[in-house]
Curated annotation (Swiss-Prot):
The keyword Repeat does not apply. This is Regulator of ribonuclease activity B. Belongs to the RraB family. It comes from Actinobacillus succinogenes (strain ATCC 55618 / DSM 22257 / CCUG 43843 / 130Z). Interacts with the C-terminal region of Rne. It is found in: Cytoplasm. Keywords: Cytoplasm. It comes from the Bacteria.
Length: 142
């Protein structure tokens, strides 16, 4: 997805949203949007993460993978919780794609999760925090 035009990104966004809503995902929910980022240089990937964080986004931990040729590739997600509206995601991409390109990274599109309109509670907890410290409860019990 590195060389996608803004029009291609917008078309893909609308297709993803349409598919989610057609499958019954909750149109009124807040969605965790994960913009997928990759780079062959870990130090440059970190610079992208720092810039994204400074721009107000959350970032996931980096992972090391291998590309199709067995070469190490580093990846992480730039994350925001927003309404599932194309205009919001378009604006995020307009901000993030140049930021990623500035450091020679790869923008590999975005994804989210199905939101069940009949769910009793938010799977991320009452505070809506996606990146809660999973060990916080363990520390409090000690």
């Amino acid at each position: 997805m590195t060389h996608a035009t803004p029009q291609e990104l917008q078309a893909e966004t609308r297709e993803i949203i349409e598919n989610l809503l057609n499958d019954g995902s909750d149109p009124n929910a807040l969605y965790i949007i994960e913009h997928h980022i990759a780079h062959y240089d870990f130090d440059k990937l970190e610079k992208i993460a720092v810039d994204a964080f400074k721009a107000g986004y959350e970032v996931s931990d980096a992972e090391e993978l291998e590309d199709d040729n067995g070469k190490p590739l580093y990846c992480f997600d730039i994350v925001a919780e927003v309404e599932l509206k194309a205009e919001i995601i378009d604006a995020q991409q307009q901000q993030l794609v140049p930021l990623v390109a500035k450091h020679g990274g790869i923008y590999d599109g975005w994804g989210t999760y199905f939101e069940d309109p009949n769910a009793d509670e938010d799977e991320y907890g009452e505070d809506g925090e996606f990146f809660d410290d999973e060990f916080a409860d363990d520390d409090e019990k000690r």
